[in-house]
């Protein structure tokens, strides 16, 4: 790992902590838990960035990062006596696919304004599916640790 990758990782983590902290404040998270929301958002986004850097596609990296956010959030909730969603929901929001969704919607507007074009339709479908799979991976990954760690009966 070079210095440029470490610098990019640090920058990515700091810039991901800011919206995680902002959404935690919007969701009325207790003041004592705000720093943990920001840290968890930075950890999740930074780990996703590293997975993407080392060749994993963004959908799978988002799934793994959101599972990691869920597991860490459950552990911190036991330590800080709070519900896991206090930490996890605000931490996962910086990973939502805003650019893909925006590009898909712009393609829809251009198709309605300019008429059908195969290139615009391809851009729309590609970005819409990419955004949908990322959102699905985030929601599934955030819910799986709760299903695994709070299970009362044995798995078999």
From Swiss-Prot:
The record's subcellular locations are: Cell inner membrane
Q: Per its UniProt record, what InterPro entries does this chain match?
A: ThrE_2 (IPR024528), ThrE_Dicarb/AminoAcid_Exp (IPR050539), YjjB (IPR020914)
Query: Which keywords annotate this record?
Result: Cell inner membrane, Cell membrane, Membrane, Transmembrane, Transmembrane helix, Transport
The family database entries (Pfam families) matched by this protein are listed as: ThrE_2
Membrane topology type: Multi-pass membrane protein
Domain of life, per UniProt, equals Bacteria
Family in the record: Belongs to the ThrE exporter (TC 2.A.79) family.
What the entry lists under NCBIfam families is as follows: PRK09917.1 (NF007391)
> What protein name is recorded for this chain?
Probable succinate transporter subunit YjjB
Q: What is the lineage of its organism?
A: Bacteria, Pseudomonadati, Pseudomonadota, Gammaproteobacteria, Enterobacterales
What's the name of its gene? Answer: yjjB
């Amino acid at each position: 790992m070079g210095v440029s990758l470490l610098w990019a990782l640090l920058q990515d983590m700091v810039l991901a902590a800011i919206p995680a902290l902002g959404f935690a404040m919007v969701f009325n998270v207790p003041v004592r838990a705000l720093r943990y929301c920001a840290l968890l958002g930075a950890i999740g986004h930074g780990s996703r960035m590293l997975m993407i850097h080392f060749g994993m596609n963004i959908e799978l990296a988002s799934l793994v990062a959101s599972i990691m956010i869920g597991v860490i959030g459950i552990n911190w909730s036991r330590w800080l006596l709070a519900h896991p969603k206090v930490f996890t929901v605000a931490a996962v929001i910086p990973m939502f696919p805003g650019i893909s969704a925006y590009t898909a919607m712009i393609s829809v507007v251009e198709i309605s304004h300019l008429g059908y074009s195969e290139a615009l339709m391809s851009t729309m479908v590609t970005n819409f599916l990419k955004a949908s799979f990322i959102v699905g991976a985030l929601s599934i990954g955030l819910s799986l640790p709760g299903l695994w760690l709070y299970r009362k009966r044995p798995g078999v």
